[in-house]
Each structure stands twice: as structure tokens, then as C-alpha cells.
């Protein structure tokens, strides 16, 4: 029954790089459609691809285009997703079969980007922040599908920790239960997206891309299921004040609850609200941390290709 070719499209550049054992870095597309306003989203996505190239790897931005999981978007496709914005379906694992069957378009979350990367054979992925356990999840059960994907899908994800709108402690507990290693890149503390500190420890602090690549290669070579989180702090000069950002996050969460916003609309609403409350400072920080993650992911992918 398996007929992957029908649903997967890999760009020639990515296909060739993988065939030659060159480093490739997967990139998500929800950040383009739902994470930032146009045209800043397109500009950021193209800059991220450029940073990956400058650090020796081939970028593979992933989305669902006309019913196919497309690994390696063209500039035109990135522009399209950026312009369409929130009109594009935010696609997680559950959405894939329906969107593919309908020949529809979708922007991939962390979970779906991991699926696309794994199907194509890409082992390293750079994003902003991963999804996790939402605040109040003990009553709402609002837990991102990203976490379950980490338990199943063999892709290393470089991020700036989980988005600080989440319950960081419970997110780490969930990842521990699922056996997912959380690596701090040059840090013993999990970064909290906009800030370098969260008060929570990572499982291991590793200080260079080569060591991270070795640990990831060991997991792959042992045939162990699931991925790896590499938490890379936002550069200090772009980090936001902890109390300032937390008070704005709390205000945004309060409004979200008051308006009854739930499910996959929650994160885009909160990020947009926080951007407005901080007069655009949070968006500027978001862009810088994504750039930093792209650089580190490319370095890890290069080291992995040498093993």
C-alpha cells in the first residue's frame, strides 16, 4: 500500500546534496505563514536559507504544496506562503493525510517538518522554538503534537528552547517520559525563547557542534526511535529582560483565555499579541534567535556529514 512518491516532492538541489552525503538543514514554514507579518516573514525565511548556505549546508524549507510534502521550497513558494499568511492551513501530523488527499497547501509545524525531513532523509532541522505543554494543560490537555513527534521521528531539532508562552517545567517532564534527550548548546540551563534563562536544567551541556553531532550519530547508529532537542540560547545582545517579557506573556495568556481561543490558534494569537505589547521588540528577538539556530544547525549538519 505504501506509495511515498505520490505525496513527497524533494527539490533537485536537496536530492543531490543527500545523494552526495552533503549536509542539509530542514526549515519549517509555519514561521512564514503564522509566525510573522508579511513581508518580514519572507525576508526572514530567505535570510535563514542564506545563513544555512554561508555555514556550509543546503537549506530545505518544507511545506505542503498542492498536496505534496515539499522538501526544498522555491523562492516563489516561500513568497506565496508569506503573502497568504493565516489563510494557509497550519498543518500538524493529523492534517497531513487530508491536505495531501485534497491537493491543498499547508504550512508545516515542528512536528510536520520533522516528518517531511525524515521521509526525505534529512537529519537536522532548525526552528525558532518548539511546541510543548501549554499553561493550564492539567485541565485543558493542550499539549503540542511536537512533543509526541520527538518521541517517534529521528530528526535533531535546534531551537531556542520551547516558546516561553508554555509551561516549561511540564514540557521537560513530558520529553523525559518519552526518552527525548534535551541538550543545552553551550548552556546548562534551558533557554526560554526570548530569554537565555528559564530556571530549568537541560539533560546535558555540550559545548561544540562536533560533540552534538557525535551524540546524534550514536542515537541514529543504535537505531533508537525519536529525535533530539538541541537548545541554543538567543544571543545575549538580543535577549529580552525576563520580568518584562514574562509580564507581557501573562497579559497575553490572560486575554487568550478570556477570548476563549483554543487549539492551534493559541500560539499564533499569543505571539502576535506579545509582539504588539512589546512594540515589536519580541519579533526582533524572534528573528535573531532563528538566525542563530540556523547557523548552529548548519554547523551540526556539517559535522554529522563527516562522521
Feature map (PLM): residue ranges:
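Solvent-exposed alpha-helices and their adjacent loops that cap or buttress functional pockets
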Residues: 15-19, 24-25, 54, 116-119, ...
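Anionic-ligand binding region
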Residues: 196-221
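A glycine- and small-aliphatic-rich helix-loop capping segment at beta-alpha/alpha-beta transitions
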Residues: 39-45, 77-82, 132-151, 174
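General beta-strand structural signal in soluble alpha/beta enzymes
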Residues: 25-27, 59-64, 106, 124-129, ...
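N-terminal glycine-/serine-/threonine-rich phosphate-binding loop
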Residues: 1-54, 119
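Glycine-rich nucleotide/cofactor/substrate-binding loop typically near the N-terminus or early
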Residues: 29, 34-36, 42-99, 221-237
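A C-terminal functional module that forms or caps the active site or interfaces directly
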Residues: 226-292
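Active-site glycine-rich loop that binds ribose-phosphate moieties when present
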Residues: 109, 138-151, 155-176, 210-214
Amino acid at each position: 500500500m505504501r506509495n511515498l512518491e505520490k505525496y513527497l516532492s524533494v527539490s533537485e538541489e536537496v536530492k543531490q546534496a543527500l545523494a552526495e552525503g552533503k549536509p542539509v538543514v530542514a526549515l519549517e514554514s509555519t514561521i512564514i505563514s503564522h509566525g510573522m507579518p508579511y513581508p518580514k516573514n519572507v525576508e526572514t525565511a530567505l535570510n535563514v536559507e542564506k545563513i544555512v548556505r554561508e555555514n556550509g549546508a543546503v537549506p530545505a524549507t518544507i511545506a505542503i504544496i498542492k498536496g505534496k510534502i515539499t522538501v526544498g521550497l522555491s523562492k516563489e513558494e516561500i513568497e506565496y506562503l508569506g503573502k497568504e499568511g493565516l489563510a494557509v492551513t497550519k498543518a500538524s501530523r493529523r492534517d497531513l493525510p487530508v491536505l495531501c488527499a485534497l491537493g491543498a497547501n499547508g504550512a508545516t509545524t515542528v512536528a510536520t517538518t520533522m516528518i517531511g525531513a525524515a521521509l526525505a532523509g534529512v537529519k537536522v532541522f532548525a526552528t525558532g522554538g518548539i511546541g510543548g505543554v501549554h499553561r493550564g494543560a492539567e485541565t485543558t490537555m493542550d499539549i503540542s503534537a511536537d512533543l509526541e513527534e520527538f518521541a517517534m521521528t529521528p530528526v535533531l531539532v535546534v531551537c531556542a528552547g520551547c516558546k516561553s508562552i508554555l509551561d516549561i517545567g511540564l514540557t521537560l517532564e513530558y520529553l523525559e517520559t518519552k526518552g527525548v534527550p534535551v541538550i543545552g548548546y553551550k548552556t546548562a540551563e534551558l533557554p526560554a525563547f526570548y530569554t537565555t534563562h528559564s530556571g530549568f536544567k537541560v539533560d546535558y551541556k555540550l559545548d561544540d557542534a562536533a560533540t552534538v553531532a557525535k551524540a546524534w550519530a550514536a542515537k541514529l547508529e543504535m537505531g533508537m526511535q525519536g529525535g533530539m532537542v538541541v537548545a541554543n540560547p538567543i544571543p545575549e545582545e538580543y535577549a529580552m529582560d525576563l520580568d518584562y517579557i514574562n509580564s507581557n506573556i501573562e497579559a497575553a495568556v490572560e486575554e487568550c483565555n478570556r477570548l476563549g481561543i483554543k487549539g492551534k490558534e493559541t500560539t499564533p494569537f499569543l505571539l502576535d499579541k506579545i509582539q504588539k505589547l512589546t512594540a515589536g521588540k519580541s519579533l526582533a528577538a524572534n528573528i535573531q534567535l532563528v538566525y542563530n539556530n540556523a547557523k548552529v544547525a548548519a554547523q551540526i549538519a556539517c559535522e554529522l556529514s563527516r562522521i
